[in-house]
């Protein structure tokens, strides 16, 4: 049975600090995503982002945490009779759940209906993600004898969230005019600077995401090592994105995020140079992965969650088991076989679960907005508003 470790008051504050930064990452997700698509759908997308946050908080309280760490903790959480240890742990972990679920909007932007999206967020945040969380951090893999290391969620959060989002986008189908005679067409974003700003907000919050994955505040060497590895992966991601895209601003900004995604798994184990290499690889692969998803799989991945989250998460999980990227005293702690098995299991849960959830919603209440609403713009057609004044 999973037990939350005892925390001193300073550890509780440390977890609240981390949870606050992870919560603020939501602002980064919103800005990064809305900048990458058309202005006529911006306000609608903001509503989706707000609703998935509420959905996860509700679902994770009543069922998700129980699946992850044991249902004996549910009643204390619901009734407010929990101790500081449980409350602090729940606050941090619900933010991880919210991060995993909110990735999905990047793949389904500009065409999904509000109600099925909200229901999907409830199911993913309350059931599907907690299954993965139990395996990774709740003792599931360990009980099965699988040595899987995922310190801050390259696999549990990003590989999972990216693949679920791709499955939702696959079920939805591409946006109108995305493919003409089977060939993908560029649909430019309306505000690249706000997307880049969003990437910076995400990077700021990522320090809480990674450093906050420590068991407490006492081990200063661990915290400093995690912070340094995070910083070097960020740099590698930027350079990789710039090199592979010939300085395209979106790929460069997304490269920063890709590097941060990839470093999460082994951020406590990588050397600074190892972290840089991991970030570099994640940044470089973006345009090639995006092209494969767009041209071969025919999935309209609006905000590149495939390369930024799914593929970068996979790279991070695998790299956490490669000895030459790790500190000398870390090599014995991980197994490349365990990393590969863990990645396969997470991917299967995300792909199969995502297809079942979103295909089920599509067959029952319908996933997609009308063709007319999509052409007019969801802000005007559904919300009767606009994101920007015409004056």
Swiss-Prot record:
One of its GO terms (biological process) is ammonium transmembrane transport. It comes from the Archaea. Its main location: membrane. PROSITE patterns: AMMONIUM_TRANSP. GO terms for cellular component: plasma membrane. It is found in: Cell membrane. It is a multi-pass membrane protein. Keywords: Ammonia transport, Cell membrane, Membrane, Transmembrane, Transmembrane helix, Transport. InterPro entries: Ammonium/urea_transptr (IPR029020), Ammonium_transpt (IPR001905), Ammonium_transpt_CS (IPR018047), NH4_transpt_AmtB-like_dom (IPR024041). GO terms for molecular function: ammonium channel activity. The record marks 158, 309 as: Twin-His motif. Important for optimum substrate conductance. Involved in the uptake of ammonium/ammonia (NH(4)(+)/NH(3)). Transport is electrogenic. Belongs to the ammonia transporter channel (TC 1.A.11.2) family. Homotrimer. Interacts and forms a complex with GlnK1. This is Ammonium transporter Amt1. It comes from Methanocaldococcus jannaschii (strain ATCC 43067 / DSM 2661 / JAL-1 / JCM 10045 / NBRC 100440). The gene is amt1.
